[in-house]
Amino acid sequence: MQGGRVVLGLLCCLVAGVGSYTPWDISWAARGDPSAWSWGAEAHSRAVAGSHPVAVQCQEAQLVVTVHRDLFGTGRLINAADLTLGPAACKHSSLNAAHNTVTFAAGLHECGSVVQVTPDTLIYRTLINYDPSPASNPVIIRTNPAVIPIECHYPRRENVSSNAIRPTWSPFNSALSAEERLVFSLRLMSDDWSTERPFTGFQLGDILNIQAEVSTENHVPLRLFVDSCVAALSPDGDSSPHYAIIDFNGCLVDGRVDDTSSAFITPRPREDVLRFRIDVFRFAGDNRNLIYITCHLKVTPADQGPDPQNKACSFNKARNTWVPVEGSRDVCNCCETGNCEPPALSRRLNPMERWQSRRFRRDAGKEVAADVVIGPVLLSADPGAVGQQEEGGDGAAVMVPSVGTGLVCVAVAVALAAVGVAVGIARKGCTRTSAAV
């Protein structure tokens, strides 16, 4: 495999009422053409016929991932110490020397996993990292790094024992009904904003289209703002290195840089939706080729006008000025000075102090806010390593890799024990990252 990081995708689901089931397995192998990778029940490892390099079990409180050390189907076993789970780089739980497998077992919230909330589903997203150690001669390596995204899907209304999941909710403000629900979400969208898109296959020079939303069961009129966004190499926005994309209560500061086109999209499709685009980037000096973006989303009543603390401002390079999505241009004046806090908080804070002070802040009942993480967004090391999505049989989706790239895409048909359901990677709704308040 040449010139890039391998990206594989796994998806695992639990269906309401299913207490346990045999985990689904996926096999893959190279068949002549080094770019012609395939997944499915008929694939065979060149080392061990019928072996499954990666198997996932989505259990009630944890996930269990088993990785065969012949990860690439070449007959060459990788070093178990080179495999880790999640952004926190958790080590394996056990080794099976007889079967040459490495097993990771971790709680659903452990090892830096990201949880997503959709109206019907809880989605836990993590990844397996393969970072090969140098060969005996430290100036060379013989295999490429690999990132294997993993998702576990659970019904939000019921758990696997058929007992209702009862999350704790907070009302929008004291005037709203206690039955109301606020669900904040970030979605990665296609170029025309019509559908969600996978998190893989981005290259430097591409654009990330991000859609922020808030929904309530009773549809109380709300206006959504993206207060701040920080990119990092993990879901922890406080980690280092980090990069501020949106700051100062809604100023898209990345668009102020000369070589970017980052901006909010005007007009909004709805008051409770806000879209913005950013130019793809990576962190210099880091070979992981991935980023997480943590955004602080908040809402105000729809009839409350924008102000310096509640705004969405982009920098217009042609006019050399900041412009708002709505409201008077005066609300954006503070974007240039960086002093957008109300008088009581007007002291100049560094970006991380501002970030920490805003987490889940409620301002006298006028706003409800939450931090939402989107990622990992995976970058292709090689130009042209973007797959094309096609529909496959039995509800599966097929990601067809471009010829000559190191990107491995998948076709998945998942069989759940006693349940006649098939699900696939990159289906609509599987790339949404949300937070419920």
Swiss-Prot record:
Primary location class: membrane
Disulfide-bond pairs as recorded: 58-152, 90-111, 229-295, 251-335, 313-332, 334-340
InterPro entries reported for this sequence: ZP-C, ZP-C_dom, ZP-N, ZP_chr, ZP_dom, ZP_dom_CS
Positions bearing carbohydrate: 159, 168
GO biological process, one term: positive regulation of acrosome reaction
Tissue specificity statement from the Swiss-Prot or TrEMBL entry: Detected in the ovarian perivitteline layer. Detected in granulosa cells in ovarian follicle (at protein level). Detected in granulosa cells in ovarian follicle.
Effect ascribed to mutating residue 241 to A: No effect on dimerization or secretion
Effect of residue 142 to A: Impaired homodimerization and abolished secretion of processed zona pellucida sperm-binding protein 3
Topology of this chain in the membrane: Single-pass type I membrane protein
Propeptide residues per the UniProt entry: 361-437
Molecular function in Gene Ontology: acrosin binding; identical protein binding; structural constituent of egg coat
Entries under SMART domains matching the protein: ZP
Keyword Secreted: yes
Known outcome of mutating residue 292 to A: Abolishes secretion of processed zona pellucida sperm-binding protein 3
Residue ranges of domain ZP in the record: 57-320
Extracellular side: 21-405
Topology, Cytoplasmic side: 427-437
Biological role: Component of the zona pellucida, which mediates species-specific sperm binding. Directly binds to sperm. Important for egg fertilization.
Assembly and binders: Homodimer. Forms higher oligomers, once its C-terminus has been proteolytically removed. Forms heterooligomers with other zona pellucida glycoproteins.
Free-text comment on this protein's domains from its UniProt entry: The ZP domain is involved in the polymerization of the ZP proteins to form the zona pellucida.
Family affiliation: Belongs to the ZP domain family. ZPC subfamily.
Entry protein name: Zona pellucida sperm-binding protein 3
Source species of the chain: Gallus gallus
